[in-house]
């Protein structure tokens, strides 16, 4: 089984949290709402990976003004690729508290939508199990 280290930003701006809706045909949680994030590449430092993933998935305009390591956990997930292939992966999640200076988002094709959500409305979204666990651990659910 392949192992991946995943950097995952919990991004907040003025009391609202960023959720991204996964594309229906790919990823670990197709069609569900999630936090952004992705894999650390070989030779890449953790914060570099976090900033790269934010740029790739959310666009160049989103500015993270504060990044603080928060927690970690692991899991085994089945990832679905755009071509329909599936793979079981051992995931190590490194989760960061992040504050953005703005809300300028330009999502890539991994996502079909995004939303800035008040804490009391987070439970209204179809959150994937990993995001639900993270938000509950943070005391937001």
From Swiss-Prot:
Gene3D superfamilies: Nucleoside Triphosphate Pyrophosphohydrolase. Residues 1-141 form the Nudix hydrolase domain. Signal peptide: none annotated. A motif (Nudix box) lies at residues 38-59. The keyword Transport does not apply. Pfam families: NUDIX (PF00293). Coiled coil: none annotated. Its EC number is 3.6.1.9, 3.6.1.12, 3.6.1.-, 3.6.1.23. One of its GO terms (molecular function) is dUTP diphosphatase activity. SUPFAM superfamilies: Nudix. Catalyzes the hydrolysis of nucleoside triphosphates, with a preference for pyrimidine deoxynucleoside triphosphates (dUTP, dTTP and dCTP). Monomer. Belongs to the Nudix hydrolase family. NudI subfamily. This is Nucleoside triphosphatase NudI. It comes from Salmonella agona (strain SL483).
């Amino acid at each position: 089984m392949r192992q991946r280290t995943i950097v995952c930003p919990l991004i907040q701006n003025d009391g609202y949290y960023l959720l991204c809706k996964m594309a229906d045909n790919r990823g670990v949680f197709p069609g569900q709402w999630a936090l952004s994030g992705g894999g650390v590449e070989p030779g890449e430092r953790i914060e570099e990976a976090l900033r790269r993933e934010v740029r790739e998935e959310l666009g160049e305009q989103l500015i993270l003004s504060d990044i603080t390591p928060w927690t970690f956990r692991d899991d085994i997930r089945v990832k679905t690729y755009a071509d329909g292939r599936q793979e079981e992966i051992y995931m190590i999640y490194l989760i960061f508290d992040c504050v953005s200076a703005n809300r300028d988002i330009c999502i890539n094709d991994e996502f079909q939508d995004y939303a800035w959500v008040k804490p009391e409305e987070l439970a209204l979204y179809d959150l994937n199990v990993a995001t639900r666990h993270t938000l509950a651990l943070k005391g937001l659910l």
